Regions:
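His-Asp-centered metal-binding catalytic motifs of divalent-metal-dependent phosphohydrolases/nucleases
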Residues: 38, 54-73, 81, 103-110
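Divalent metal-dependent phosphate-bond-processing catalytic cores, especially two-metal-ion Mg2+/Mn2+ enzymes
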Residues: 23-55, 65, 94, 111-196
Length: 196
């Protein structure tokens, strides 16, 4: 398993290189920095949850590839991520079981289905930015990115959607709740100030 974890680091570097070299320059939000952050959070949360080794391997693979589909097809990032998982994992010596479980985790992350602890950890790793002090800057980057990729929405409507999302979102693991830097109410207030 130690060797596989080292191999996952190689996969992470490969995906980050793809973001840096092949991705559209206007991926202001879905970028190498966010991939690194999701991978780090998945690592931290899986260790805190004391997941079995095989679950950690599959979770880390899913974290690496979760956003990779944005490189090839912004409108269908899930499809792109799944294709990349199927293509790259055999090249790196991972089993069909790893491929299927990584794909399941990624699909569940995109549709918001949280059946297992690994699903919950990937969810919390993906949305960790909602509790960060630089949330406003990140949500602004997401708005710019989506606008340039065809989102028809003015800033005020966008901010209302973000407020609603913040209020309805919940971290699913105790560790993620504990690590949250900024409470929901403060983020919503910050959005209101930003809006005015």
């Amino acid at each position: 398993t130690r060797l596989r974890l080292l191999t996952i680091q190689d996969l992470e570097e490969m995906v980050i290189r793809m973001f840096e070299e092949d991705a559209a320059p206007n991926l202001y939000f879905h970028n190498a920095s966010l991939v690194r952050n999701i991978c780090n959070q998945a690592d931290l949360l899986s260790n805190a949850a004391q997941l079995p080794e095989e679950d950690i391997v599959n979770l880390k693979i899913a974290a690496v590839f979760l956003l990779a589909g944005f490189i090839s097809d912004y409108q269908k990032p899930l499809d792109g991520a799944l294709i990349l998982v199927e293509k790259k994992l055999p090249e790196y010596g991972f089993s069909q079981g790893n491929i299927e479980e990584a794909k399941r985790l990624i699909e569940n992350a995109f549709i918001g289905r949280n059946e297992t602890m690994t699903d919950k950890i990937l969810h919390d790793a993906r949305y960790e930015y909602l509790g960060r002090v630089d949330y406003i800057k990140l949500t602004d980057r997401l708005f710019r990115e989506m606008s340039e990729f065809g989102l028809k929405c003015d800033r005020r409507a966008w901010l209302e959607i973000q407020k609603k999302f913040l209020q309805e979102h919940d971290f699913l693991t105790d560790t993620a709740r504990m690590l949250r830097n900024v409470p929901v109410e403060d983020q919503v207030k910050a959005l209101s100030v930003y809006e005015s």
